[in-house]
Amino acid sequence: MKMLQGRLPLTVLHLFLLLGGGMTQQRPQGPIKDINGLPAQGPTVSVRPGPDPSDKVTFQDCPVDIFFVLDTSESVALRVKPFKTLVTQVKEFTKKFIDKLTSRYYRCDRNLVWNAGALHYSDEVILINSLTRDMKTLRDNVETVEYIGKGTHTDCAIKRGIEEVLIGGSHQKENKYLIVVTDGHPLEGYKEPCGGLEDAANEAKHLGIKVFSVAISPNHLEPRLSVIASDASHRRNFTATSAVGLTDDEIDNTIDTIIDMIKENAEQGCCTYECKPSRGLSGPSGPPGYEGEIGKPGLPGDRGLPGDPGRQGDIGPVGYQGMKGDQGIRGEKGGRGAKGSKGDKGKRGIDGVDGQKGEDGYNGLPGCKGSPGFDGAPGSSGPKGDPGPYGTKGEKGVPGTPGTGGRPGNTGNTGDKGDPGSNGLAGEKGESGDEGDAGADGSPGKRGEAGELGPPGVSGGRGARGEKGEPGPPGDQGRDGPAGPFGDPGEAGPQGPKGYRGDEGPRGPEGPKGPRGAKGLPGEQGIAGERGDDGRPGNGTDGFPGFQGYPGSRGDPGSNGTKGYPGPKGDEGEQGEPGDDNVSPGPPGPKGAKGYRGPEGPPGPPGPGGPPGPDECEILDIIKRMCSCCECTCGPLDLLFVLDSSESIGLSNFQISKDFILKVIDRLSRDEHVKFDADNSHVGVVQYSHGQTQEVVAMGDSSIQSIGQLKEAVKNLKWIAGGTWTGEALAFTKDNLLKRFTLEKKIALVLTDGHSDILRDKTPLNTLCEVTPVVSVGVGDIFQNAPNSDQLVQISCGGKPYSKGLSLQRTSFAELLDDGFLHNVTSHMCSDRKCPDYTCPITYEGPADITMLVDSSTRVGNQHFQTSKSFVKLLAERFLKAKPPPSGSARVSVVQYSGQNQQIVEAQFLTNYTVLEVPVDNMQFINGATNVVSALRAVTELYREDSLAGVNKKLLVFSDGNTQEEKGLLKVVQDAQSAGIEIYVLAVGSRLNYPNLQVMLTGSAADIAGPFPEERLFRVPDYTSLLQGVRYQSISRRIALKSSQ
């Protein structure tokens, strides 16, 4: 219809020129000028002089307002390296578009001209240029655009563009366009401040502004771009960037397609039937045409003039109500009115129809573990058992308590929607409108001269079928029609799931007595009862005695009777003759009864001393193995989280980041026994995006006094969705959070995608390095870009000598919640745990020279000798790595011995364990006799030659007391004592020579020596036990103590 309206004026004009006759086509003589004396724009027509020679025309402009809305947010500026690449491509796209905005002449004698403007936006809107026809200035201003790089408020930008084209644009309201170039992010997560994207798009539609949406690829959000576009024809997968492999020709084709659509729509708007350009000069007469076809019947003529009024007639009878008259003839169209003034802003339009159902969202995170379910339904009945024996009838049971009411079952699924009802009855036809007033009589036109009949025209061929036109804009919402009858009820929905088993209901009333059952089978015979009591004697009198019976038959012989009882004791006999003499004693008599308890005797002498009980080292080891309080602790510490809340993180990833923080806190509390409260460890969280957007929640805030309140505050953090200024956020943490946390041990964890805008944010990324260790965790962003490892290394103080930081990377945010990763993070935070000191440390009260005399004889054997070497190394390490004495040092010697003159000094008074370890490892088993006397003599000589004066001299002898030469043992021990040597003995095994051990420990003969000095004798059951437990700690600590001599 619009196409017909646009061409109708041209058809009428051509017909009028043909009928006018006498027209000739002339070439313009020189440049044609408009009424102001300026050269006319566009094609011109010269007309033969008529009644008014000055009637020269100009072509009216057909203005089109086009406004560019350019996205320069973080998701565009920082998505592709090098940064600003996509912003540069967007600017190039806009400049190419501007270059192609050239004027065009329409056949309705109107000239298309462009008014163009632009803005760019992020979380703020910056006007590049208002609407102008100066394309060069607009192009230059676009070239100077610098990206904002923060959040994305597309709704605000579109509404600002609407404002610009309405206020600064032309009066041609149907020729207003917005070109929105964006990636569509973010999809969700925060309240858009200007009413939302759909609200902005609907406002543009209601105001007749057509919106094209052009994608910034890759990873654009197509659903959001479809919402922005006025309809599908204004989207068409338009793309402004070459990051997805598009060529320049393909981008140029996008621009040409949009411009062609605008020009075609503008022609329909400018070239309508209302277009009445001034009449041009008559052209030359054309050749006579062929005779035309017989015309169709003409339209009804105008109504004639009313006749003169007749005379007054007689009053007739009252008539019946007449039928409603036919509709009056439509009056002629009035002339074009003057241009109206701009109207007031219209009221808010009606709400648009509901949009289609959105795509399914991403799967939610696994929920928390549910509460225990209700008891399951009872199992199916088992097979019927064999009938048992009939029991005795039981007593009547106690009436049960009424049960509570059962829980209602779950509501079943809603049934399918019923079929729509049939259409309602059509409403009554409305009454015709009142008859219109008659139009003014037109002046009769002059009768034209009849033209010559032309020959019949040749029938034209059938034209090609026209292409289907674009769908028209949606019409206004119709008024609600009458409600139809209710539809038939829908089919019953599928049966709902079986509800949970309800609780046992109350006991019902006793039912009626059932019919008597069939006679049961006979039961098994019962066990015979006990004999009943004798009955009471009868009441009758004694009967008379009966007659004597006949004698019975002879019975069988009886059995032998039992032995009779002994008879009475006889009289005492006469004394017998004396027997022969017997020199052997008789047997001893029986033991007498136990006598009475005698008086308490005097106390006995003291018994020998028992073996020594566990010493301090052994007690500490027992405590360590039995007591949970001996575990190492991580705290107290101050824990700082710095959380990236920028747009490139995405809402779902931001939620995972908060869950990660909460899980780290929980693991530190549970596994590392960190206690978070005001007097122990503290936690603080800083979330950030671009400049001045930091937000901190920490223990110690007025509303956060416990770890539970802090967790709740972390859960309530809202996604900022702006730029990424990590350096500024770290400086904010240093200035605002670290000042509040004053514990010596602290650590910061920075969670980011590693894409900080270092072009805008000049704060160094290693700001926290000098004040606290930093763990940087980098995770890929929503565009699947890997984190920037260089930035992560800077954040975690990589390459600094004082650094205790750690840099970790993950592909996706879901990996943050993996148990293994959480364990690694918390283990690093607690790498320097504070553990109780159960090593039983050595304490020297003065300088000491310690010698270990190792048995290398056949009695020991090579395998046990190797065990002795390992034990010697443990002792030596303890002696030499302990805290040195206040003055001087501790020195250690190692000597092995066997037979006569078989003593080897392996290490002589060394102070460095590393140096001593090598000769001990190289010790070779001698495998000779056992001569302790010769060994003690050699060691005494060693002390006299190399030991320092004023030091404590200690000697540990590996011996079980057995020696080939016992005669000189006492003397060499006394010589050693006189040299100031204190002797300790390590005795292994059960075959010990205690007399010799007593001589070695006391320096006295075995028969006159006092009790064993147990503090200097170390008994070990076997060589394997040497390396078990804390025996080496006990022995070394006891040797290192001050001498007891």
Swiss-Prot record:
Comp. bias intervals (Low complexity): 297-309, 375-392
Biased composition (Gly residues): 400-409
Pfam families in the cross-refs: Collagen, VWA
Protein's organism: Xenopus laevis (African clawed frog)
Main location (coarse class): secreted
Localization: Secreted, Extracellular space, Extracellular matrix
Name this polypeptide is given: Collagen alpha-1(VI) chain
GO CC annotation, single: collagen trimer
